[in-house]
Every structure is written in C-alpha cells, then in structure tokens.
Amino acid sequence: MITNPGEINLDDSLRICQETLKKGRAEGFMPLTVTVIDVAGVIRATLSEDGSGLIRAKIAYAKAWTCLAFGVSTNKLRDIFEDQPRLDKAIAGMQTMADGNLVPTPGGLIIQKNGKNIGSIGVTGDRSDQD
C-alpha cells in the first residue's frame, strides 16, 4: 500500500522493486532490473539482479520515464506506434527531445494512488513481452 497519497516514497519504491524481482524469479525470468521514478522523473529506487546487463538500469529508467511522458503504459504506447507506421519520423524527433529516454516497448507502467499518477515503474531484462 502506498503510504503517502501525494508522492511515492523510498520505502514504497523499494518494496515495489523487491516484489517485482521476486515475481520475476518465481516466473523464471532472466535477471531483471527495476526502476521506480516519481512524477518529476526522479529515481526513487533501482534494483538489479545479479547477472543483469550493464545497460539495463538506463533501459528501466527510460521505460518508466516514457510512461509518465505519455500518460500510458509502454505496452499501450507500443500498440499506438505500431498502428501508426508514419510516426517513425515523429518518434525519432521525440527521441532527440527526450534525451534518448523514449522506449515504447513493454515493461513500463504508471503507478497511481486514488486515480492520481504518483510515479511509474520500468522493468527490463527478459523478453519485452514479459518485462
């Protein structure tokens, strides 16, 4: 349970990361990296399992950032982009404006409390459809 409805605190962020890693291990996923950020894009927690690749923390952050930037999960965003093939040039432009943080692949979810966005989570390490 989120303890402060206006923000996501460190304890909640760590718990979310730990629970995500626990679920990944139970499902037999490859080593995961999980990042939780607040609505300002500030990293509240990042945890990487042993064997997780060097770039995974950046990817997890970018997935979380992408959710907040567009207000939807990265799964939904991927579907939107796939349905609009002409968006390729726009995506390239947005990637530049986003300092490389635009990652519209599954693994990012918005965290809400009482219908209000308070942060997001990015997960990477396994196949995108399992992140």
Model segments located where?
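Flexible, solvent-exposed loop/hinge segments and secondary-structure transition points
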Residues: 1-131
